[in-house]
């Protein structure tokens, strides 16, 4: 019984410490609306195909799981062509946990900007920016912001390096798929 009480006490102290650290981290960032928002996680890559080809693949929501490793599926819920206001539901694995990810397209400027909001348990936003380079290549930059449902400041600090590697690997997978297709599929 004494061991159990010690364990409960340590657990309570750990939760209290995590809460205090989270509040302290949140106090360092004070946006206008009072909600703490972590810095975006930025990933960038250059792809050896023209911007139009990159855009077509990037904007095909239902094919995004082919290159986004932790995105298991996407179902579009809004009829018609994809554009601002299009809603979809996805299943994403965040740090190994399957989570529903309702999204809405917030920016859609072909072939340059594709932005979404995440409206599920993990809230936030993502914006892909495409830039045509002089040699027929395309630079893709992704800024992703995710806000955890509990201890958002502390978990944001912990998740940034992990998710940064995952998001960069996703862009590398997109690049590899597009560059292989450019070589193997005749124009």
Predicted regions and their residues:
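Short beta-edge strand/loop motif at the mouth of beta-sheet-based domains
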Residues: 62-100, 106-113, 183-187
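Hydrophobic pocket/interface hotspot
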Residues: 53-58, 64, 88-90, 105, ...
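Hydrophobic ligand-binding cavity/cleft-lining segments
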Residues: 3-6, 13-83, 173, 187
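Hydrophobic/basic alpha-helical segments enriched in Actinobacteria
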Residues: 40-47, 70-73, 96-97, 131-134, ...
């Amino acid at each position: 019984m004494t061991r159990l009480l010690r364990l409960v006490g340590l657990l309570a102290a750990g939760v209290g410490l995590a809460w205090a650290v989270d509040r302290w981290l949140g106090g360092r960032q004070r946006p206008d609306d009072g909600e703490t928002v972590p810095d975006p996680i930025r990933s960038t890559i250059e792809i050896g195909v023209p911007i139009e080809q990159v855009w077509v693949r990037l904007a095909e929501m239902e094919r995004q799981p082919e290159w986004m490793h932790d995105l298991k599926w996407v179902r579009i819920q809004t009829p018609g062509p994809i554009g601002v206001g299009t809603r979809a539901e996805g299943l994403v694995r965040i740090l190994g946990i399957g989570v529903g990810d309702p999204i809405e397209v917030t920016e859609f400027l072909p072939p340059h900007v594709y932005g979404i909001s995440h409206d599920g348990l993990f809230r936030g936003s993502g914006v892909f920016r495409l830039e045509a380079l002089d040699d027929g290549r395309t630079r893709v930059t992704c800024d992703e912001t995710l806000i955890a449902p509990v201890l958002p400041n502390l978990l944001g600090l912990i998740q940034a390096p992990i998710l940064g590697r995952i998001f960069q690997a996703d862009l590398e997978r997109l690049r590899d798929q597009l560059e292989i297709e450019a070589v193997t599929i005749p124009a």
